[in-house]
From Swiss-Prot:
Disulfide bonds: none
Family, similarity comment: Belongs to the UPF0337 (CsbD) family.
Record InterPro entries: CsbD (IPR008462), YjbJ_sf (IPR036629)
Classification via Pfam families: CsbD (PF05532)
Protein's name in the database: UPF0337 protein PP_4561
Lineage top rank: taxon: Bacteria
SUPFAM superfamilies named among the record's database cross-references: Hypothetical protein YjbJ (SSF69047)
Amino acid composition bias (Basic and acidic residues), ranges on this chain: 27-43
Region spans: Disordered: 27-59
């Protein structure tokens, strides 16, 4: 997978995670909030992975 795809997937996961956290907070659902936080962190990691891939590609 290219760095750009990793970054895009990361942004999507981060956004979905934020939504889950918000819904979990509004509905007082700690499990959903935790799932959202985990997905947000996954998204952040994917973005870092994409940035590293792009950095390695550049001469």
């Amino acid at each position: 997978m290219s760095g750009t795809k990793d970054k895009a997937k990361g942004l999507a996961n981060e956004a979905i995670g934020n939504v889950k956290q918000g819904v979990g907070k509004v509905t007082d659902n700690e499990k959903l909030r935790a799932e959202g936080k985990a997905q947000e962190l996954k998204g952040e990691a994917q973005q870092v992975k994409g940035n590293v891939k792009d950095a390695v590609k550049k001469p």
